[in-house]
A protein has these predicted regions:
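Accessory terminal regions of nucleic-acid processing enzymes
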Residues: 1-268
């Protein structure tokens, strides 16, 4: 794998004046930072099959209403505030660059970074801005960082050829309900991520081959429903793969066990 450090990211497009749909079209030209967790099977929101369908432009059979659309919208609108709080707490200069970048050695790797940081020595790093509800703050306990965010930022560091990033998260309505973590570049972790992303792009997306499902059973079931529709006994049966069948059976079994545990708990 070519992981030489003497490269500069390419600018794919200036995003300042892009519409939402135009921006999404450019994102489909490659893999973005927020896609990394799905490829690694660690996304809390989507399976690798969902990501594949999005990249090749498959329209869902059922457009399900996003349960967390408000949280996503709040997170987007508060990015500037998160950056402002981070700058105030650290004294570091932060600034946006409204461009989508591309890795020159792996052109399927894209990066649309929230903010950049200028450190006192003149070097540049990355700032990723997040929000979460108060109950989710425990995911940041003991200097922790949610794994999907770690993968997102490692992807960005690789594309931008930078060595340090901060991830900042606001979980309340004042600046004291705020955490930030530093993430240094890790070449071994980066190489593994690039290898997995390369395989996904070249073996699945470019060849139009559906990747096998993996990850949480509830996400798999939601994905099957989204792209194959609800069951209708009046129409012919559809076929699913053996892996999909096992995942569905596992999900149903776990759901039943959870239901039984909740019943016993209420009876105690």
């Amino acid at each position: 794998m070519n992981t030489a450090l003497n490269y500069q990211p390419e600018v794919l497009v200036d995003t300042a004046d892009l519409s939402r749909e135009e921006w999404l079209d450019y994102r489909r030209l490659g893999i973005g930072g927020s896609d990394a967790a799905a490829i690694m099977g660690l996304s809390p929101f989507a399976t690798i099959r969902d990501l594949y369908f999005d990249k090749i432009g498959v329209t869902p059979v059922i457009e399900e209403e996003e349960e967390n659309w408000v949280a996503k919208e709040v997170g987007h609108r508060l990015e500037d505030l998160v950056a402002m709080i981070f700058a105030k707490k650290t004294g570091l200069e932060v600034f946006p660059v409204r461009k989508m970048f591309r890795h020159p050695l792996y052109p399927f790797m894209l990066a649309d970074v929230d903010y950049f940081i200028r450190f006192p020595d003149g070097s540049i790093g990355i700032l990723e801005c997040k929000t979460c509800n108060y109950n989710a703050k425990d995911k940041w306990a003991d200097d922790g960082i949610p794994e999907n965010y770690v993968l997102q930022v490692r992807h960005y560091l690789a594309v931008m050829n930078m060595n340090k990033a901060y991830i900042a998260c606001l979980y309340g309505n004042n600046e004291n309900e705020f955490v930030y973590r530093c993430l240094e570049r890790d070449r071994m972790e980066e190489e593994e991520l690039i290898e997995q992303e390369k395989y996904f792009w070249e073996e699945y997306v470019e060849k139009k081959i559906e990747p096998p499902y993996s990850g949480k059973p509830d996400l798999i079931l939601a994905s099957i429903r989204k792209y194959k529709g609800y069951a209708d006994k009046s129409i012919p049966e559809i076929s699913i793969s053996s892996l999909e069948s096992r995942s569905l059976e596992k999900y149903l079994k776990l759901s039943e066990e959870k239901s039984q545990l909740e019943k016993r708990k209420k009876g105690d």
